[in-house]
Amino acid sequence: MDARMEAKKPYLIICEGDSEFAYVQELNRFLNEKGLPIVFMARNAGGGGFKNLRQICRTLKTRKNGRTYIVADKDIYQRDDNGNGTAYGKEKDHMPPFLFQTWNFEDFLLMHFSLDVVSAWREEAARSGHLRNPLHGSAYLPIFQAFCVRNKDALKFMFPYEKGDMPFALTDSHVELLFANNAEDSFPHSEFATLIQKILQ
């Protein structure tokens, strides 16, 4: 990573919930320790529903300025739960860009580890049906937790994992693997990771 860059204004990241908020805080710690003059200001929206995120944007008086983004799980938009996908399609042009995690934060977490781990998770997701159609949290979270236990030597997570946790401290290796595992048409995929990589280049 190139630390020779000018100090920049903070990026405002509207996080759909506790997990994303915790991640951005950990990312800031990592960047600060690396001496990189990049800051992400996180705001916790308390839920990833489109109406909720739209209201947060209105409250914060956000605009499309190249420095404000919304980080959200894609699962409820893909399933169109409560019309979220439909509303997003109609109104997205009037809001800051959405950076989707495919499908959810837990998928995103595993992108920070080896290709062997990511490949094993893809196989698990294919068996459960999560690969093609995102499962609801009540269905995928036990699968994810069991996967983490089976792969604890490779993951070195804090156990037991609960939603809202940032279960490991970011390192150079984690960030490099996140970028390496973030192929455009693969699963998992993170548009937030794409933004981070672009900023750090």
Report the location of each language-model feature.
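C-terminal accessory helical subdomains adjacent to catalytic cores in phosphodiester-
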Residues: 1-8, 21, 25-42, 54-69, ...
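Conserved helicase motor
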Residues: 44-47
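Short hydrophobic beta-strand that contains or immediately precedes a catalytic carboxylate
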Residues: 12-16
